[in-house]
Amino acid sequence: MLCLLGIQLQAQQPMYYDASRFPLLGKATQDTGARYERLPDSLKNISRPPLWNLSRNSAGMAIRFRSNSTRIALKWENLFNNHMNHMTDVGIKGLDLYCWEENGQWRFVNSARPNGKTNQATVIANMQPKEREYMLYLPLYDGLVSLSIGVDSLSSIDQPQINYPIREKPIVFYGTSILQGGCASRPGMAHTNIISRRLNRECINLGFSGNGQLDLEVARVMAEVDAGVFVLDFVPNASVEQMKERMETFYRIIRNKHPKTPIVFIEDPIFTHALFDQRVAHEVTRKNQTLNEIFNSLKKKGEKDIYLIHSEKMIGEDGEATVDGIHFTDLGMMRYANLITPFIKKMIKR
């Protein structure tokens, strides 16, 4: 009886597999010092320290796998154990599981909530034991030291059998804290991840909180990606002076490697508190005017396949799309995706 009970208990314990054995989506380069980092290790002593540290956040990355398990469990260790007062810990350093449905859409399953630096959680249980394709989104504002996926000990976990999201010609995004995912409630609600699911296309997130300042080495990393579209959303972080000094150079680094790939510029959002804060309103107007001037200058020089998305309707007019007047809630992320997705869809269908 004790032997039988021991076997039953053992069968109830999940078997864990290192996530490094499964495909990782959302990286611009494989030349990183660790698997879940975003910039090549060669930039460690070249990039500004805050930019480099943010590149160690796993924003926009996702693991793809397949399993017939009745449950999915996770073990993970965060790199920094970050915490912020305007964003959920799930969004910062948690994980987010989706599965592919027969109707041709990715469906949210559940999130894994962190309790600290080292974590263990059962994401979902009591499922029917049938084969499912999964996508696991990684933390937006922290990095990972390790990640393991747990399944029933008698079940299988394998490589994905469908090539979704499509990895050919990914969409490469560059930008700020908002683009990195601030302040989505969970990783799957970052707008780059929403757009990826809607288009079923891999997206690469090169958002760096407070540091989307047109650092030219980032443009060089982007230029090495065989992208379908490049989206440049840096205006909230870049000063007018930085735009005048670096924007065209940043653009040309990418354009020289990709003469016909669409490159999209996006205006600064009309932040909700700009209705009241005159200084903020003036700065947003000034930055957007500068962006438009440089963009129009490029057009006059004969540059083709460049586009500008205006921000008037980006996050709505009701003032309800941010957590602090600046960083998007899930509502803001959805509204951004609603504006951007149809435009990008046209670009990748050309």
Which sequence ranges carry the predicted segments?
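Catalytic His-Asp segment of secreted/periplasmic serine-dependent ester chemistry enzymes
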Residues: 224, 271-350
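Catalytic nucleophile-elbow at a beta strand-turn-alpha helix junction centered on a G-D-S/GDSL motif
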Residues: 168-192
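Short helix-loop-beta junction
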Residues: 192-205, 296
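Active-site-proximal beta-strand/loop segments in catalytic clefts of secreted hydrolases
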Residues: 174-176, 206-209, 233-237, 266-269, ...
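Oxyanion-hole/transition-state-stabilizing segment in secreted/luminal serine hydrolases
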Residues: 183, 195, 212-249, 253-257, ...
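N-terminal secretory targeting modules
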Residues: 1-170, 348-349
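Glycine- and acidic-residue-enriched helix-capping/strand-helix junction motifs
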Residues: 84-87, 181-189, 281, 285
